[in-house]
A protein has these predicted regions:
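Short Gly/Pro-enriched turn/cap motifs at secondary-structure boundaries
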Residues: 21-22, 113-116, 147
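Cytochrome P450
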Residues: 170-176
């Protein structure tokens, strides 16, 4: 059931007011409301694209949602596990779907690299136990990647191929995922 014009207008006014004062409010936002039937009930943008920006927020503005993609990909993966399409603990399947995982090395404390002893599974990717990390969380990885100019946020696939921080399945580190849809 669509929103009546009065409710639609009232919601848009609330969104606009939230973005009026750039100092005490929010710079800009896009709000989309979808009914349980999947139909769009409201789509409205207000304010600017960021603090200090004069570019207006629009329904076509692109957002960097960073690690929120992990939640979306995790749900999608678990739906595929439920359907029997993916397996949580099959390293051969996971590395077959993401062949770049096969050649990853493990970064040792002395800065040298060693071969992986185990394959990487979907469960490891989803639970941050595959060995991936971020340079800003891990000094050893930062020291290794800095001289070669690797930047995990560049969008280049070669920069995503940083070494693992530990053998797959033998530790935990919040980090990038090889199944990251941004790459």
């Amino acid at each position: 059931m669509p929103l009546n014009e009065q409710v639609h207008s009232h919601l848009c006014d609330i969104i606009d007011k939230a973005c009026e004062d750039q100092k005490s409010g929010i710079p800009g936002t896009t709000v989309v409301v979808v009914g349980k039937d999947g139909n769009e009930l409201l789509a409205h943008s207000a304010g600017n694209r960021g603090a200090g920006s004069n570019d207006p927020m629009t329904l076509d503005s692109i957002f960097w949602i960073a690690s929120c993609t992990k939640m979306l990909v995790g749900v999608a993966c678990m739906q595929l596990v439920e359907q029997g399409v993916l397996k949580l603990d099959d390293a051969e399947q996971t590395e077959g779907l993401c062949p770049e995982l096969k050649s990853l090395k493990v970064l040792l404390p002395d800065g040298s690299l060693e071969e992986k002893k185990h394959g990487i599974t979907l469960r490891m990717l989803l639970t941050h136990t595959a060995g991936f990390g971020y340079t800003f969380f891990n000094e050893r990885l930062k020291q290794w990647s800095y001289p070669i100019g690797a930047d995990e946020f560049s969008g280049r696939i070669e920069d995503m191929k940083l070494p693992l921080l530990f053998q797959p399945g033998e530790g935990w580190q919040y980090g990038v995922s090889a199944i990251n849809p941004e790459s």
